[in-house]
């Protein structure tokens, strides 16, 4: 009976051990926690387990323990495992977007404002391939050094003012001005007594009388018609004549243009018209001069600036007037290429502002005229260049001789028309259009123009 009770207690202990060591137990046998001081204080004295009581009873009765049983280790309080949560892969949290990760973080409020200073703007540098013709005395091309935007300290401002004053002082010394024209500290800046206010309002400026005109009689009806057409303003279509007709009337025309009777009158009349006319009128004068010079050369003649010729005597004046009017255009808008614009500006400066026609001719002789603006100016400078051929270079003489040979009536006006038409078909700038209208003028005011040639 006693043995049966012992066996039941042993089986009960084995079942308890199997339940405690199963995989569903929340504690592990190999992970035990040592009891703390608080646990010892709070815990009450527990009764010994049943197997210890049985073991004590057996030892007291002299019964040996079973051989196949392993003594159980004392288990302390084990740490509870964290609960395992099963989440669906469809409901997993998404990773932050890389855009927000690398984007600029915006903070609202005054405390989070960005205090980083804005980046400084770097000065624009001019491309090194841009060439400009400097205003030299020889008319050759020179490369201007690129201007760099540098900040000078305020200390150098006084030094710069001193340099300017010194330069002005040197220029005044070169002019050799009298002491009465030099300003001092107490003298007035200008003399108001020389203003003629006592004459009253002035509606017209005094103009000297033109040279006298002596009537001339020609037996040729065509020559008479040309002279009558040159004495009035009219449309260019009413003054048209073929180049073959001019070649046929060469002898009669030569006797008229080289006559001394009315040479001063006609030259004065043509200069007045050229000074007040636009590019259309001046282009018509250039067409007339080129056709007449071509006719003279074809008949074995030649011309020089000392010879008397009513048509060719005004060639230099017409050239200066044409280039001056041409500068009124918005050249930077009309010519978009930097090389073309540089050549146009330099030639225009030499002719119109510097009065250095020979240097402009030499410059044109050294470049290739592969654009319309340069070829137009070359045609305008052809007659003045041929008249000054003894002063210009050999390349310049060859250029103008070739242009005079290959010229056809209508080339000058055709180039001018195409330049304006092609540009303003794309340009919508109102200032450019206004400048073009002012520079072109009207072709009706052409007194002094004898004929307009046609091919």
From Swiss-Prot:
Free-text description of this protein's post-translational modifications in UniProt: Proteolytically cleaved by host caspase-7 (CASP7), leading to its inactivation, thereby preventing expression of viral lytic genes.
Residue numbers binding Zn(2+): 333, 423, 427, 432
One annotated GO biological process: regulation of DNA-templated transcription
GO molecular function list: protein sequestering activity; RNA binding; zinc ion binding
Cellular compartment(s): Host cytoplasm; Host nucleus
CC annotations in GO: host cell cytoplasm; host cell nucleus
Keywords: Activator, Early protein, Host cytoplasm, Host nucleus, Metal-binding, RNA-binding, Transcription, Transcription regulation, Zinc, Zinc-finger
Acidic residues composition-biased segments: 23-42
Compositional bias per record (Low complexity), positions renumbered to this chain: 88-98
Motif (Nuclear localization signal): 101-107, 121-130, 143-152
Induction: Transactivated by ORF50 protein.
Annotated region described as Disordered, given as residue ranges: 17-163
Site keyed Cleavage: positions: 33-34
Zinc finger (CHC2-type): 333-432
Miscellaneous comment in the UniProt entry for this protein: ORF50 and ORF57 are the earliest genes expressed in the lytic cycle.
Subunit-structure text: Homodimer. Homodimerization is required for transactivation. Interacts with host ALYREF. Associates in a complex with RNA, and host export factors NXF1/TAP and ALYREF; these interactions allow nuclear export of viral transcripts. Interacts with protein K-bZIP/K8; this interaction promotes viral gene expression during lytic infection. Interacts with host PABPC1. Interacts with host AGO2 and TNRC6A; these interactions inhibit host P-body formation. Interacts with PRKRA and EIF2AK2/PKR; these interactions inhibit host stress granule formation.
Entry domain remark: Binds viral intronless RNAs.
Family per record: Belongs to the HHV-1 ICP27 protein family.
Name this protein carries in UniProt: Post-transcriptional regulator MTA
Species this protein is from: Human herpesvirus 8 type P (isolate GK18) (HHV-8)
Organism ancestry: Viruses, Duplodnaviria, Heunggongvirae, Peploviricota, Herviviricetes
């Amino acid at each position: 009976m006693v043995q049966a009770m012992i066996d039941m207690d042993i089986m009960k202990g084995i079942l308890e051990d199997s339940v405690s060591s199963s995989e569903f137990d929340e504690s592990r046998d190999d992970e035990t926690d040592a009891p703390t001081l608080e646990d010892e204080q709070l815990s009450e004295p527990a009764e010994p387990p049943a197997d210890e009581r049985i073991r004590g009873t057996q030892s007291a009765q002299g019964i040996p323990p079973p051989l196949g049983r392993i003594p159980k280790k004392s288990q302390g309080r084990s740490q509870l495992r964290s609960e395992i949560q099963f989440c669906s892969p469809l409901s997993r949290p998404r990773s932050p977007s890389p855009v927000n990760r690398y984007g600029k973080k915006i903070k609202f409020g005054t405390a989070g404002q960005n205090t980083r200073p804005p980046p400084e703007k770097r000065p624009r540098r001019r491309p090194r391939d841009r060439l400009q013709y400097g205003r030299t005395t020889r008319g050759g091309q020179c490369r201007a050094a690129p201007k760099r935007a540098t900040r000078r300290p305020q200390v150098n401002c006084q030094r710069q003012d001193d340099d300017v004053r010194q330069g002005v002082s040197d220029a005044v010394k070169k002019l050799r001005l009298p002491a009465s024209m030099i300003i001092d500290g107490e003298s007035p800046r200008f003399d108001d007594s020389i203003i003629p206010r006592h004459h009253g309002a002035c509606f017209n400026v005094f103009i000297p009388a033109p040279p006298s005109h002596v009537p001339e009689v020609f037996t040729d009806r065509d020559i008479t018609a040309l002279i009558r057409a040159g004495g009035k303003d009219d449309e260019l279509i009413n003054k048209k004549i073929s180049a073959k007709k001019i070649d046929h009337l060469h002898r009669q025309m030569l006797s008229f243009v080289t006559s001394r009777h009315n040479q001063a009158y006609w030259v004065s009349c043509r200069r007045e018209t050229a000074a007040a006319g636009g590019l259309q009128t001046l282009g018509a004068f250039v067409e007339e001069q080129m056709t007449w010079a071509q006719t003279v050369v074809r008949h074995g003649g030649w011309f020089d600036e000392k010879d008397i010729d009513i048509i060719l005597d005004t060639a230099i004046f017409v050239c200066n007037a044409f280039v001056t009017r041409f500068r009124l255009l918005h050249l930077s808008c009309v010519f978009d290429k930097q090389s073309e614009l540089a050549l146009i500006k330099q030639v225009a400066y030499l002719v119109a502002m510097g009065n250095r026609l020979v240097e402009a001719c030499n410059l044109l002789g050294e470049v290739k005229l592969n654009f319309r603006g340069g070829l137009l100016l070359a045609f305008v400078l052809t007659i003045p260049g041929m008249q000054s051929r003894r002063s210009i270079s050999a390349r310049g003489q060859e250029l103008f001789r070739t242009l005079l040979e290959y010229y056809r009536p209508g080339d000058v006006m055709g180039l001018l028309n195409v330049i304006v038409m092609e540009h303003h078909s794309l340009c919508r700038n109102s200032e450019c259009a206004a400048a073009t209208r002012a520079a072109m003028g009207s072709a009706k005011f052409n007194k002094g123009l004898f004929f307009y040639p046609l091919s």
